Amino acid sequence: GIPYWTYNNGDEPLVAISLLDTSNIANQLDSTPRVFYLGGNPEVEFPETQEEQQERHQQKHSLPVGRRGGQHQQEEESEEQKDGNSVLSGFSSEFLAQTFNTEEDTAKRLRSPRDKRNQIVRVEGGLRIINPEGQQEEEEEEEEEKQRSEQGRNGLEETICSLKIRENIAQPARADLYNPRAGSISTANSLTLPILRYLRLSAEYVRLYRNGIYAPHWNINANSLLYVIRGEGRVRIVNSQGNAVFDNKVRKGQLVVVPQNFVVAEQAGEEEGLEYLVFKTNDRAAVSHVQQVFRATPADVLANAFGLRQRQVTELKLSGNRGPLVHPQSQSQSN
């Protein structure tokens, strides 16, 4: 669930051996190893298990689509999925351009169509990166983790009988993230509602105004259940192979299951907004937003990974300053 990149700055070839612990407590999927690439056009790393997933996906999409979008939507989806194997290749260029407030050419490069370099990219001239002092940051993180682990063992923790059991996360003043044109997001977890620690659950309330977008993101440590409580919109979910496993309109009363680490994006309809609740199977569910990942990634890494010019990298990193809630029309007007 944590995005990372590696770079060999030495004079000799580097051979790295990765151990994937699928029985880890943080893994809430199954024992099938999956690698989610944000960029490039990677080769399949686990062909035995990935082929089974691909067969199931093809069987699913070979069925009649019916009222969920029709043959035209199915053909468009299959065309998009032929371009690459990264998770961003499962989104259309138009949608990525709206989400990241970039030009169409930049959005196409983010989808990595027909990129022959696969997972490994050769950097001409080396990377120019400013390295922060990491030791102090690591020590601070260790101290914070120690303090968190000691919480609940100081004799002052709440008992189950005295725990607060209700929280209204739909209140506008309660919003954790807010965009006056796009919408708001509120969360409740064991830090704000301690009883959730015993249930191992957390919740998220999302309100999107008309055409508002909750940009592509994924849950690092939880599966989630999305329940629409008002309005209508569209939900798109992409798996580790870059396939859009779900791309449909949703309306009041409908449920959508989003597996851990699968990238998901939501957009409200043109006629009315979209309000929904997300129930997550972790009392401290963590979310990664693609925009924020790009913002934190060194410019040279983005330029080489996606084949972008410096100007394109700059506009891509600036999109991370706007947050995960986006309104396409207001972004185009700001340009």
From Swiss-Prot:
Domain Cupin type-1 span(s) in chain numbering: 167-314
One of the Pfam families matching this protein, by short name: Cupin_1
Alphabetized InterPro entries for the sequence: 11S_seedstore_CS, 11S_seedstore_pln, Cupin_1, RmlC-like_jellyroll, RmlC_Cupin_sf, Seed_Storage-Functional
CDD domains listed in its UniProt record: cupin_11S_legumin_C
Residue spans of biased composition, Acidic residues class: 135-144
Keyword Disulfide bond included in the entry's annotation: yes
Basic and acidic residues bias: start-end ranges: 105-118
Disordered: annotated span: 47-87, 102-155
Keywords: Disulfide bond, Seed storage protein, Storage protein
One annotated GO molecular function: nutrient reservoir activity
Record-linked PANTHER family: GLYCININ G5, OS03G0336100 PROTEIN-RELATED
Similarity comment: Belongs to the 11S seed storage protein (globulins) family.
Function, as annotated: This protein found in the seeds of many leguminous and non-leguminous plants is the source of sulfur-containing amino acids in seed meals.
Subunit: Hexamer; each subunit is composed of an acidic and a basic chain derived from a single precursor and linked by a disulfide bond.
Name recorded for this polypeptide: Legumin type B
Organism field: Vicia faba (Broad bean)
Gene giving rise to this polypeptide: LEB2
